[in-house]
Amino acid sequence: RSAGHIQTYYNHKSMHYYHPYRVTSSKPLWHFGHGLSYTEFEYSEPVLDCTKLKQNGTLTVTFNVKNVGSRDGEEIVQMYIRDEKAQVARPVKELKGFKRVFVKAGESVAVQMTVTPEMLSFHGLDMKPVVEPGDFTLMVGPSSEDSILKTIKFTYND
């Protein structure tokens, strides 16, 4: 098996039993954002400044990244968003932001990222950009691997 061995589909319903192939795993060999470091990082649970995003508003997510290793290091923090229900099939998660942070060994850094309504838009059935009201899941972590992402939910109302 290699990194280019099999296609990965991102636009499907978010079901735990999704498996488009019968003979092999549909999981990627390396998740997007996977990388090696000389140290290790831990993420705290994310906190939102509000849980309802309005049409012209913003939402800020704050979380801590702690360097639990013995060396100083840089981490690329990634933020993903999932639309829980839309009129068209949406990606299970979409990268909506990233930030490089430097953390000294044993220390913790507070990270803030902003969500805007434009980040929730997609091309609807009429092929025009649309932002639908509804529930969304925000995920933060070092890569797109589900098991290490920290999640929190919010709603959008226009």
List PLM regions with ranges.
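Glycine/Thr-rich phosphate-binding loops that ligate phosphate moieties of nucleotide
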Residues: 27, 98, 144
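Intrinsic-disorder/low-complexity, polar/charged segments enriched in Ser/Thr/Lys/Arg/Asp/Glu/Gln
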Residues: 58-60, 108-112, 149-151
